[in-house]
Amino acid sequence: MISVNDFRTGLTIEVDGGIWRVVDFQHVKPGKGAAFVRSKLRNLRTGAIQEKTFRAGEKVARAQIETKTMQYLYANGDQHVFMDTTSYEQLELNEKQIEHELKFLLENMSVQIMMYQTETIGIELPNTVELKVVETEPGIKGDTASGGTKPAKTETGLVVNVPFFVNEGDTLVVNTSDGSYVSRA
């Protein structure tokens, strides 16, 4: 058990029969009344975000999440196949389980598979990935100084707003948490 006063971003807890990751939290001490902790939690099974308020000092169960390094192999219909890099066991995940992460997955990419007891609850990507631009408008000479952006489609189908100097065939570094352009590789 862990006190809500010890909440940290990224902490995984069990509340109301679900497994949640703390996305954001705020300790509130009103002038009148008892202190409380306002939190924003992400359900690791469904991806839904919920705001929940706890009384200060309340205890919640900490969820023990194990991670395994696995390699993404291929898509088989709406199933995606991953291989354990040590035991060579294969694991299939449904498209709905990894909907957000699909935009960043490339074949042979190493990812962290999150397991709760024996249940696979999702994957954790690296902070950034390198994706190749397959479609974008050509930049016009002189546009690099203006600081604007244009849309670019990557090899995974993700559309990223990029600076005008980025061309088709360039490799981009993309932030996996929000899908934003970081730099050229």
UniProtKB/Swiss-Prot annotation:
Q: What is its main location?
A: cytoplasm
The answer to whether keyword NAD applies is: no
Q: SUPFAM superfamilies in the record, alphabetically?
A: Nucleic acid-binding proteins (SSF50249), Translation proteins SH3-like domain (SSF50104)
* Cellular location(s): Cytoplasm
**Example GO biological process term?**
peptide biosynthetic process
What pathway annotation does it carry? Protein biosynthesis; polypeptide chain elongation
As for family, the record states: Belongs to the elongation factor P family.
What task does this protein carry out? Involved in peptide bond synthesis. Stimulates efficient translation and peptide-bond synthesis on native or reconstituted 70S ribosomes in vitro. Probably functions indirectly by altering the affinity of the ribosome for aminoacyl-tRNA, thus increasing their reactivity as acceptors for peptidyl transferase.
- Name the chain's protein: Elongation factor P
Provenance organism: Bacillus licheniformis (strain ATCC 14580 / DSM 13 / JCM 2505 / CCUG 7422 / NBRC 12200 / NCIMB 9375 / NCTC 10341 / NRRL NRS-1264 / Gibson 46)
Gene symbol here is efp
